[in-house]
C-alpha cells in the first residue's frame, strides 16, 4: 500500500495544476474551503467505518490477504479513472476500497484481538488523537509552511520503499524491521500535516474533489494505525516474554 500511496500522490500533484506560486499563498481558509473540509472529513469517517467492517469480516470469515490487497489497489486505480462528476459511483468505489483495505489489515487486527484487545483500542485512539492534533496544527497555521515538507517527505517515502524492497530480497532482522516501522510512522505523521495543507491549497485553487482528498487522508490514517499497532504489539510481546523468563528463573 505504501507503493500505491506514492503513485497516487504523484498522480494528484500532476493533475492539480498548481506550482511554486501556490506555496507563497498564505490566505486564510475561506468559507467555501471550510465547507469542503467538512465534506472531506465526513467522507473520511464513512471510509473508516467501511474499513472497520472489512476488518471485522476478516476476523469472522478470514477473507483478508493478497487478493483483498490487490482488490483495494485495483479499486483505487478505478476511482482515479472515473470522472469527478460521477460522485455516487466514485463514493461507492471509495467505500469498496476502504472495506478491502480493512480486510487486508484484518490479519494484524486479529492478531491484536487474540493477544490483547485493549491494544487495538489504544492504538486506534492514539492514531485518532495524533490525526486530530496534526490536522488541527495544519489547519490553524497562518502560513502554509508545511507544504515545503513535500520534497522531504517524498524522499523519505522513497527511502522507506527501498528499504522494504531490499528486505524482501535480502531479508531483515528484528532491529531493521522496527527501524522501518518507526521511520514509516514518522513519515506518515508528516504526511498528515502536509496532505491537510495541500488539500486546503488545492481547494483554494478550485479542486473540490472531496472523495480523492478523503482517500488521501484515509491512506495516512491507516498507515499510521498499522505502524502504531505493530509497535504496541512488539512491546507487549517483549514484556510478556520478559515475564515468562522471570517466572522460569
Swiss-Prot record:
The keyword Membrane applies. Pfam families: Bax1-I. It comes from the Eukaryota. GO terms for cellular component: membrane. One of its GO terms (molecular function) is calcium channel activity. It is found in: Membrane. The chain crosses the membrane at residues 39-59, 65-85, 93-113, 119-139, 151-171, 213-233. Belongs to the BI1 family. Suppressor of apoptosis. This is Bax inhibitor 1. The lineage of its organism: Eukaryota, Viridiplantae, Streptophyta, Embryophyta, Tracheophyta. The gene is BI1.
Amino acid at each position: 500500500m505504501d507503493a500505491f500511496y506514492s503513485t497516487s500522490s504523484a498522480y494528484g500533484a500532476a493533475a492539480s495544476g498548481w506550482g511554486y506560486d501556490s506555496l507563497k499563498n498564505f490566505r486564510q481558509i475561506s468559507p467555501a474551503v471550510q465547507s469542503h473540509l467538512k465534506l472531506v472529513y465526513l467522507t473520511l469517517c464513512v471510509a473508516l467505518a467501511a474499513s472497520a467492517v472489512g476488518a471485522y469480516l476478516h476476523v469472522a470469515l478470514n477473507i483478508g490477504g493478497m487478493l483483498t490487497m490487490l482488490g483495494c489497489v485495483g479499486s483505487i486505480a478505478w476511482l482515479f479513472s472515473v470522472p469527478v462528476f460521477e460522485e455516487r459511483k466514485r463514493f461507492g468505489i471509495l467505500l469498496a476500497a476502504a472495506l478491502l483495505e480493512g480486510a487486508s489489515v484484518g490479519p494484524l487486527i486479529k492478531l491484536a484481538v487474540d493477544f490483547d484487545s485493549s491494544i487495538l483500542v489504544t492504538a486506534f485512539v492514539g492514531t485518532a488523537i495524533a490525526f486530530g492534533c496534526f490536522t488541527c496544527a495544519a489547519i490553524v497555521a497562518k502560513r502554509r509552511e508545511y507544504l515545503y515538507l513535500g520534497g522531504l517527505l517524498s524522499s523519505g517515502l522513497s527511502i522507506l520503499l527501498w528499504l522494504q524492497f531490499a528486505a524482501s530480497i535480502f531479508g531483515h532482522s528484528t532491529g531493521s524491521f522496527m527501524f522501518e516501522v518507526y521511520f514509516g510512522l514518522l513519515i506518515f505523521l508528516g504526511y498528515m500535516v502536509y496532505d491537510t495543507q495541500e488539500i486546503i491549497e488545492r481547494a483554494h485553487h478550485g479542486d473540490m474533489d472531496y472523495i480523492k482528498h478523503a482517500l488521501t487522508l484515509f491512506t495516512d490514517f491507516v498507515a499510521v494505525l498499522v505502524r502504531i499497532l505493530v509497535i504496541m504489539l512488539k512491546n507487549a510481546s517483549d514484556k510478556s516474554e520478559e515475564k515468562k523468563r522471570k517466572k522460569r528463573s
